[in-house]
Amino acid sequence: MGRPPCCDKVGIKKGPWTPEEDIILVSYIQEHGPGNWRSVPTNTGLLRCSKSCRLRWTNYLRPGIKRGNFTPHEEGMIIHLQALLGNKWAAIASYLPQRTDNDIKNYWNTHLKKKIKKFQSALSPHMASDSTTSTCTNHQFVPRSYAGDDHHRRGSSFEVINGHSSAHPSLNSPISTYASSTENISRLLEGWMRSSPKATKEKLHQNSSLEEGSIDMTGNSMAVAAVTSVQCYRPKLEQGGGELVANDEFESILEYENLNDDHHQTTDATIPSDDHDHDHEMKMDHDQKKHNPPLSFLEKWLLDESAAQGEEMMDQLSPIF
């Protein structure tokens, strides 16, 4: 148990202080100084307890006490210190030497507490809105995850129906539903790479056959031109007796062209599927072309014939002019 209050003693006066009591207390403290509050009632003859004398001096009678309204700076200090220290008014008053702890306590209970409540009530709608938005965002995250799970479930069911179920449907379902997936592209590329060598071989074979066909067509056209030229100039050979190529030479040329045509037809008809045989046939064809006579003789003969024809035309036209 604590010590009983001194004011409960018999003959101790309670209530407000009178001006006479204030004058006696102030005069005593000016002579002896503030301290040893237990001896003050007995030395001054005041019917007050020591605690009442101390509080009367510190809260009302001591010099330097500031009265009046609190400044905004003092209000901020009181609010900050009250949040840190709580309701320890004496400790708060030590940071405000011109204000007493009693004045600070009274001002807190009558003014500052109400201001803080109003400020909190004004901020409560914003805080409530922030809390609702946070809850809404939290609720938004849940359906998204649920939607993602539903999507994965649908993907897995789709794979099971198609016979492509796997142990991880969440990882494989987007790949299965995607149209141009990497697997399909790789399969297409594999098929293309497998068929590409054959296609290239066929293209090379077609190009070689086209080149040979073009050579045959040029040879045939040249042979036809030679035949027509022989037929045209054969009467002139009989009449005029000009210097033309003999029939034996034309027959040899035509036989060479026919042999060349027959050789190309046989090579085109008997093209092997194997690349080694094809290369061997090409080599044999190349060697045979080396042994055959060149076409420069035919070209030279055609050029000579065209020149002779031009001279005859000029001779025929000269008597006209």
Curated annotation (Swiss-Prot):
Induction: Repressed by abscisic acid (ABA) and osmotic stress (salt stress). Residues 206-215 have a biased composition (Polar residues). Residues 37-61, 89-112 bind DNA. GO terms for molecular function: DNA binding. Its main location: nucleus. Residues 9-65, 66-116 form the HTH myb-type domain. Keywords: DNA-binding, Nucleus, Repeat, S-nitrosylation, Transcription, Transcription regulation. It comes from the Eukaryota. One of its GO terms (cellular component) is nucleus. The keyword Lyase does not apply. InterPro entries: Homeodomain-like_sf, Myb_dom, Myb_TF_plants, SANT/Myb. The modification S-nitrosocysteine is found at residues 49, 53. Residues 196-215, 263-291 are annotated as: Disordered. Transcription factor involved in the regulation of gene (e.g. drought-regulated and flavonoid biosynthetic genes) expression and stomatal movements leading to negative regulation of responses to drought and responses to other physiological stimuli (e.g. light). This is Transcription factor MYB60. The gene is MYB60.
